[in-house]
Amino acid sequence: MTAEQLPPELQRVHMVGIGGAGMAGIARILLDRGGLVSGSDAKESRGVHALRARGALIRIGHDASALDLLPGGVTSVITTHAAIPKTNPELVEARRRGVPVMLRPVVLAKLMDGRITVMVTGTHGKTTTTSMAIVALQHCGRDPSFAVGGELGEAGTNAHHGSGDYFVAEADESDGSLLEYTPHVAVVTNIEADHLDFYGSTEAYVGVFDAFVERLAPGGALVVCADDPGSAALAERSAELGIRVLRYGSAGHAGAALAATLVSWEQRGTGAVAQIQLAGEADPRSMRLSVPGRHMALNVLGALLAAIEVGAPVGEVLDGLAGFEGVRRRFELVGTAESVRVFDDYAHHPTEVRATLEAVRSVVRQSGSGRLLVVFQPHLYSRTKAFAAEFGSALDAADEVFVLDVYAAREQPLTGISGASVAEHVTVPVRYLRDFSAVAEVVAAAAGPGDVVVTMGAGDVTLLGPEIVAALRMRADRSEPGRPGVLQ
């Protein structure tokens, strides 16, 4: 595509905070469609380097003059209000010049215009389920455009401008921005109280999902997980409004009929096999997965129904999903050393922690020996305050837990809230580690052959996985006198 096929306001843009995952994804699509992109960010990153290689002009640091990086100026400035304050000098300068300032969700909605859109939302599992739907359509030769919150393993990116008629995207519910979209198919994985710092009440948080579903395009469909009470209730309310609802879930539901049923599921190593029943078919189908966890099998059903709804053949979809390799930071294998496997996971809500550790426990159990060690970093003071006890209970699925201090992100500290707030609710052996720089050595010293270590959280805990692997290898070097390259 050429710049003429972009809306005029998106042909020459400046992006404030361009290095963030969501913003970088938008930048990739704009560049691929022939747009001119400049941007700024607080620091260098892999995402910044990749965008420069694609032609974006990026400055580190924020200054009003950054709006002049593109010769001839810009037609709009794009930002994300969650991370960028209104006092940012580039935003102040844009307003002074009369340059329109648009939020990322508004831009994404413009990029989806004219496409058949599949959007996935929910408290948990939306990145993985979105990625599954993308892989399913890719395997069927549809080449969808997509924008997702995590890096898709198969594609090595979180955004793509495709040649097909489809656009698959994750709809973030954290700040109400999902109300910018009008999808043809909406998948809701689950609904459970979260982001109360923004919404103020559970009722307000739940209400945004109802408002989102009411924005479905005419003739659109809602796909929901009937196993989750929150999304099941949404399905009932939506059906009463005349919205077409497709439910998926486990066998044995006494409520409304399921469009896709998980009849059986069996963990096999880091994958699984399952039997599923589709409505209208006489016999169940076999389904293979390359990712662990029963919750992943349910996510597959959501992606499957979404793909079928836009015309993808069932058999081809299942073949594609069998090869789904996962999403970066979703139970991602970081490395192995000294017979210790180290994984990294993005889980940052008690329900996510519980589901992930249940899956990991199955992996540990099948290996025959070894323990499960979890390095957990609470994310946001408000979330830690609200769910400290629930986090402690979820972490009890591990054999040993290392709790770090809270990753503040956009928040200011709250008096009396720290990693200790979570650690005090853990009943298995637990250590509260305040010194981030010492964590890798402490965990490596605690791990033994056959153990599985999981670093967990939405913050910079992800940096520790490689450090733990390196510490384990250093331990191996020290234990082998005379090994080449090892100082004696």
UniProtKB/Swiss-Prot annotation:
Catalytic activity: UDP-N-acetyl-alpha-D-muramate + L-alanine + ATP = UDP-N-acetyl-alpha-D-muramoyl-L-alanine + ADP + phosphate + H(+)
Pfam families: Mur_ligase, Mur_ligase_C, Mur_ligase_M
InterPro entries referenced in this protein's UniProt entry, alphabetically: Mur-like_cat_sf, Mur_ligase_C, Mur_ligase_C_dom_sf, Mur_ligase_cen, Mur_ligase_N, MurCDEF_pg_biosynth, UDP-N-AcMur_Ala_ligase_MurC
Lipoprotein listed as a keyword: no
One of the GO biological process terms: cell division
Keywords: ATP-binding, Cell cycle, Cell division, Cell shape, Cell wall biogenesis/degradation, Cytoplasm, Ligase, Nucleotide-binding, Peptidoglycan synthesis
Location (main, coarse): cytoplasm
Pathway: Cell wall biogenesis; peptidoglycan biosynthesis
Keyword Cell division: yes
EC number: 6.3.2.8
NCBIfam families, A to Z: murC
Function: Cell wall formation.
Family: Belongs to the MurCDEF family.
Name of this protein: UDP-N-acetylmuramate--L-alanine ligase
Organism: Mycobacterium ulcerans (strain Agy99)
GN (gene name): murC
